[in-house]
Amino acid sequence: WLIVDHYAIDERWHKELRPYCQKIMVIDDLADRKHDCDLLLDQTFGRNSDDYQSFVPEYCQVLCGAEYALLRPEFAEWRAYSLKRRENGQLNHLLINLGGVDKDNITTQILRELSYISLPNSCRITVVMGVTAPWVKQVEEQAEQMPWLTEVKVGVNNMAELMANSDLAVGAAGATSWERCCLG
């Protein structure tokens, strides 16, 4: 299997590689271009296979909807703990993660806006960014100006644990949405 997950790739690229692999799987959530694949996965809530009818070959199996969300096992492992934590309803720890890159520097904007709202003095904020994020320095500078303890973590490998130990998570609308849903 060749698994393709890239917005700039379409059937032209798939056809070029078809001779070198037995099967091609595409992960997509746009339903806006043709694919030459044997299996297509779209985890978008409410999406159905009819949305891809004119974009994939007849033989392609299309898996659509939240029931096909790809989650690492660690999220299932942290689920019970995370749901139990939610019972107290207090806001002591805020997690912010706008994906691995956050190319538009939304994280800094969120931190700035948070500084104008009322949060408990004991509240702490954890910001998670990817190693390729171009705005890490600006986010770190903004974090230092926050009225609450604010930590910036880069390139973490324990995202499920960080989410499970937060009371509220602010994040992008990608695959991490399903991770946040899993952990409550």
What residue ranges belong to the model's regions?
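Short alpha-helical segment that forms part of, or immediately flanks, the ligand-binding pocket
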Residues: 160, 177-183
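Anion (oxyanion) recognition and catalysis
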Residues: 18, 144, 181
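Acidic donor-binding loop of glycosyltransferase active sites
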Residues: 164-175
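Short gly/ser/thr-rich secondary-structure transition/capping motifs
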Residues: 21-27, 73-80, 150-154
